[in-house]
Regions:
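Terminal (and in a subset, N-terminal) low-complexity or junction segments at the ends
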Residues: 1-180
């Protein structure tokens, strides 16, 4: 049954993404309603980061961490510094019927960005030490761009393992050469 559920989830997700890409929001809502009725759930994006011997996990939009105030402050700082350095958000990866400002905000709530902010926000990692993040799904194109830029802005290597491969972000460049 698990194999069937996984494949059914994949079919529904692809269909929903196709409709969202075409901005057919009524069809997206119908697919999601059908998923709910059939109890087919989307796998949430999760990211893990180790900090001072403790593993922290985050989901998209997570606000449950004890240091979330510091993390949000660091995310805002990274967002502002990134914009000054030329970052422009790729709204196409947000497949929701919301305005552009909301899409920009939602991008900064992806689990890998929250995980990235934790070591900086807590100021507990030695300067120059790498940050290692694990993600259960493929990193989206916008987060890939943001992490490349973040590695340059904060002068740190960021090592991320997503479902496909390792990404080593250093000085604004990724080891995957932007192919993943």
């Amino acid at each position: 049954m698990m194999w069937w559920s996984l494949n059914l989830w994949t079919v529904f997700q692809i269909l929903s993404n196709i409709y969202a890409g075409a901005k057919r929001w009524d069809n997206v809502a119908a697919v999601r309603k059908k998923m709910k009725r059939k109890r087919v759930r989307k796998e949430p994006g999760l990211s893990w980061v180790e900090n001072q011997g403790r593993v922290h996990s985050f989901v998209v939009g997570d606000d449950a961490h004890e240091d979330m105030k510091l993390i949000r402050g660091m995310l805002e700082w990274l967002n502002l510094r990134s914009k000054r350095a030329g970052y422009t958000p790729n709204h196409e990866v947000i497949l929701l019927d919301v305005d552009e400002d909301e899409k920009s905000r939602l991008l900064w709530l992806h689990s890998e960005r929250i995980a990235l902010a934790l070591p900086f926000a807590l100021l507990r990692t030695p300067p120059g030490s790498p940050i290692r993040i694990i993600k259960n799904l493929r990193i989206c194109t916008d987060c890939h761009v943001a992490l490349k830029l973040a590695s340059k802005l904060v002068c740190r290597e960021i090592v991320m393992r997503d479902i496909n491969r390792f990404h080593h972000f250093r000085d604004g460049i990724c080891s995957c050469n932007d192919y993943w």
